[in-house]
Structures are given as C-alpha cells and as structure tokens.
C-alpha cells in the first residue's frame, strides 16, 4: 500500500493510519519463500506471518530484531531441511501464509522514505534469490530493466451474497494444507454438511429445506459473532482489553471469528495492544451526535516503547469499522500528532464529536461520524504496565 488509509478504504476492517501496509499471500506447498527486510534503524516495523487461520506464528520486527533484521526463509509444514547459516528458518504451520507488514510513517513528508523501504523489502523464491545474488555479484542489477512479473493467485473472489460461497472457498483453502487433529475433530462434528477439504462443495446435494436450514444457521452464526463483543476481553472504564490469546487463538473459535469481523489480522498483545471503546463513563453507547472528552492526566499517557494512537471509526450495521469522512481529514490522534495543546499541568484532553468545535478546541479535535462510533487505542511495543493491567485508560466522558 503506497498511501495511508483514508475514509475510502474498505478492504480490511479497523485499518490504522499510523503505518503503511505491505501484504502478500505465500504458497509454500512447492518451495520456500525468502523474506529480506532492509535496515529500518529505530523506525517501528513489523512483518507478521499468519497461518491460514490468522494465528501469528512468527514476526520480523523491531522488537525482536532491533532494527537490523536477518533474512528469513519461510517453509511449509512438510518441508525437510535447514537454512544457510546467515538465514533464519521460519516453519509455517500451513502452506498458505498471510504476510502482513507495517512500517511507521510519520505524516505525508515521510511517505517517500517509507516507499523506499517498502521497495527494498523482497519476497523471493530460491531461483529468484539465486539470480539476484548472481546479478549483484556481476554488478548487473542496475541493467535489469524488465522486472519479473508479479505472481497472481488463482483464487475466485468471495461472493458475500451467497452464503454457500464460504464453504466453496473454505474447503479449497483447507485442502492446500495438512490439518491438525483439533481442526479435523471440528470438521468431523460438521459431517452432515459434507465439508471435505480439497473437495468441491456441492449445494445441489441438499434438498431445498436443507439448504434453507443451512442458510438460517449461517445467519444465526453471524448474529452470534456480532453479539459476542463482550468476548473480546475485560472491560474497564468502558475500554475492552484484549484476551491473552489474541493473535493466537487456539480452539477459541468464537474469539477468532469476532476478531476476523472487527479487527482482522490483529497482532499479539506483546507486539501491539488494541483497546476498544464503545461506551462512555455511564455505559451509554458512543454516538457522534454527542460531545465527549478523553482526558489523560499528567504523566499518564499510554505507555508504549514505539508509539500510541487513538483512532476514530464509523461502525457499519454488520459490526465492521472504518474511518469516517471529515473536513480536516484526521482519523487519529497520538503521541506524534503535531500541534496538540496540553494543559498547564501536562494533561491532554481529546475532543470527540461530529460537529466542528470552538476554535480553541480544534487542535485536539478527533472528528466523529454522525452516528454510532468506536474508538481504538493502539499501543505498539506496549510497556509491561499496559500488558499486566497496572495502567488503565481513562473513561470517555460525555459532555451534556
């Protein structure tokens, strides 16, 4: 992604505006893939390796590499062998891997610098890597004027209007990786649906009544997922703190589905902590037609080694969240926001509302949608006090 997300972005729910994304799906069934990330210095970055089921199984990140990442060789579950001494081996639990990179961008003037870093981030097959190394040794890299074609995955687009399409795509995906015993047991429980990994799902095998019952079950499941927001974690001061298994869900299938709906591709808490707020200090739902203030007392800013940000979202009827269009094109406020006004005691008050506030409050205004809204506070490389619950975010206060 060459530009930061804005209100038009609808590809992934709950996007952030702090980083530029780099996204790729890796097919490891036939051969390994090499990942080379350039020296990032002190800039925040993370490349999360997620399994087919969105479990984070490995990171290339500042927290672990100190800004000087080593090359990685990512291999599938059936691959035999080892890597060269100068390459770190990453073993994936599934042949399909979602690699999602995040690189901190400090406003529009910083975009070109991040574009260069993205351009130096390489994904290569063994043959591509060997060819590049030969060309580099021969100093011919600069003469290569025709870049290799981008690989294209032969995957059909999911038809959201057809509930059976999920079975079709899902069984194809499951057929490309060996299943663990836990997932095999789940599929056995679903035997009446005739779901077989790698086999085409045939809805014609069911009667009209059976197809109707399946559609009803899918609709009920979606309602259950949307209604499971309290499953996200403990709620303190109106803020929902993530469960410890965020990003590595195990057999917590409802939590996995909830995160896929409202926070797809979430990192583990040690890499980034996501705190969600949907209610004010009196447990009333947040609505942009009201006026709110979030006040951080002096010395009580969110503790994060990398950075923190507070993002405003418009909530769709199905529970997803996206940026809201606003006259100042501001979607988040954080520790890098220029021009914030602090109190004489060092406190910070952020004003949350749809209507334009008084001029004296404009510097700290985070525009809200005209209806239901959601706040997400992100802390990248969070401090232990945030992870263990010693530090708590203050409640959002409604101004009547």
Can you describe what each PLM-predicted range is?
Residues 1-400:
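A compositional/structural signature for long, glycine/proline-rich flexible linkers
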């Amino acid at each position: 992604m060459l530009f930061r997300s804005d209100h038009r972005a609808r590809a992934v729910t709950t996007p952030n505006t702090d980083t530029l994304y780099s996204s790729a799906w890796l097919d490891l069934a036939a051969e390994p893939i090499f990942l080379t990330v350039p020296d990032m210095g002190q800039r925040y970055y993370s490349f999360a390796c997620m399994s087919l089921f969105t479990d984070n199984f490995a990171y290339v990140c500042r927290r672990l590499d100190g800004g000087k990442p080593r090359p990685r060789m990512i291999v599938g579950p059936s691959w035999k062998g080892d890597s060269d001494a100068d390459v770190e081996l990453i073993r994936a639990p599934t042949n399909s891997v979602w690699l999602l990179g995040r690189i901190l961008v400090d406003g529009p003037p910083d975009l070109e610098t991040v574009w260069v870093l993205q351009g130096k981030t390489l994904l290569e097959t063994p043959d591509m890597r060997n060819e590049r190394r030969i060309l580099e040794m021969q100093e011919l890299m600069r003469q290569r004027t025709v870049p290799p074609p981008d690989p294209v995955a032969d995957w059909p687009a999911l038809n959201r209007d057809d509930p059976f399409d999920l079975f079709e795509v899902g069984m194809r995906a499951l057929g490309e990786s060996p299943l663990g015993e836990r997932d095999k047991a789940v599929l056995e429980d679903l035997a009446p649906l005739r779901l077989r990994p790698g086999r085409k799902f045939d809805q014609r095998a069911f009667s009209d009544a059976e197809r109707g019952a399946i559609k009803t079950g899918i609709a009920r499941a979606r309602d259950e997922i949307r209604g499971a927001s309290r499953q996200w974690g403990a709620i303190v001061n109106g803020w929902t703190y993530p469960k410890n298994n965020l990003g590595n869900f195990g057999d917590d299938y409802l939590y996995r589905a909830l995160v896929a709906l409202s926070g797809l591709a979430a990192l583990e808490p040690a890499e980034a902590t996501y705190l969600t707020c949907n209610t004010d200090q009196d447990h009333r739902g947040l609505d942009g037609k009201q006026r709110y203030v979030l006040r951080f007392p002096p010395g009580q800013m969110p503790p994060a080694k990398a950075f923190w940000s507070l993002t405003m979202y418009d909530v769709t009827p199905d529970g997803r969240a996206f940026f809201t269009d606003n006259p100042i094109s501001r979607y988040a406020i954080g520790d890098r926001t220029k021009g914030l006004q602090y109190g004489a005691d060092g406190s910070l008050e952020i004003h949350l509302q749809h209507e334009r506030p008084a001029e004296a409050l404009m510097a700290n205004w985070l525009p809200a949608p005209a209806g239901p809204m959601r706040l997400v506070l992100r802390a990248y490389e969070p401090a232990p006090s945030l992870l263990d619950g010693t530090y708590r975010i203050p409640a959002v206060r409604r101004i009547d």
